[in-house]
Design a protein with these regions (language model features):
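Signature of Gram-negative outer-membrane beta-barrel scaffolds
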Residues: 1-81
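Transmembrane beta-barrel domains of outer membrane proteins
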Residues: 13-17, 75-79, 126-130, 173-175, ...
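Acidic glycine-/aspartate-rich tracts in secreted/extracellular proteins
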Residues: 93-96
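Intrinsically disordered, low-complexity regions of eukaryotic proteins
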Residues: 16, 27, 33, 102, ...
Length: 187
């Protein structure tokens, strides 16, 4: 088979500094995804021929998937002191069927081409601090990622939209130099 995926995007992001302590980030992104997959039926491809009983070896079928999305991001940062910040952010994203075609994953087939795109919302609250005269960076964040139209492959090998999934998490990080001779990176 032959698969071709194309994407076009336009992205705008602005950081608005109200004063040295408060910064607002606002962004919008438009994505246009296009995937085309052409399959040539072969005499030994029993599964494909079984799905299309009238197919003969050498016949070709082409499946297309074209979608476009508008996604957003917003964040606010408070810097109580110069070496530390507290932030909150919100972002959306989308993942249409076939966008990852050609990289060894699902691509597009007649069975999944009409599935709904996965849509994601991510919220995060975190803090970042530079300590030891800016030699060490400490970070901590809690986050929630909510996905609608989640795709999953069942025991029978078919892919379907299974509804909503949610991930709640915490992320901790340490990066920098503890002393002139000791460096640390963990997270």
């Amino acid at each position: 088979y032959n698969i071709e995926s194309k994407s076009k995007s336009v992205y705008f992001l602005d950081s608005i500094e109200f004063n040295p302590q408060w910064i607002l980030d606002l962004g919008v992104r438009w994505d246009d995804y296009s995937t085309e997959q052409t399959m040539t039926y072969g005499a030994r491809n029993a599964a494909v021929i079984a799905a299309t009983p009238t197919a003969q070896a050498g016949d070709k079928v082409t499946i297309n998937n074209d979608k476009d999305f508008i996604n957003y991001q917003a964040g606010i940062t408070f810097k109580p002191v110069e070496n530390g910040s507290i932030y909150a952010s919100y972002a959306t994203s989308a993942n249409p069927v076939g966008v990852d075609g050609g990289d060894g994953s699902e691509g597009i087939t007649a069975a999944i081409n009409n599935l709904k795109p996965e849509e994601v919302r991510t919220m995060e609250l975190g803090t970042k601090w530079d300590v030891l005269n800016d030699k060490l960076n400490l970070t901590a964040a809690i986050f929630r990622t909510e996905k609608t139209n989640t795709r999953a492959t069942g025991d029978d090998g078919t892919t379907s939209n299974i509804g909503e999934t949610r991930v709640d998490g915490i992320e901790l990080g340490v990066n920098g130099n503890i002393t002139d001779k000791w460096a640390v990176s963990a997270g």
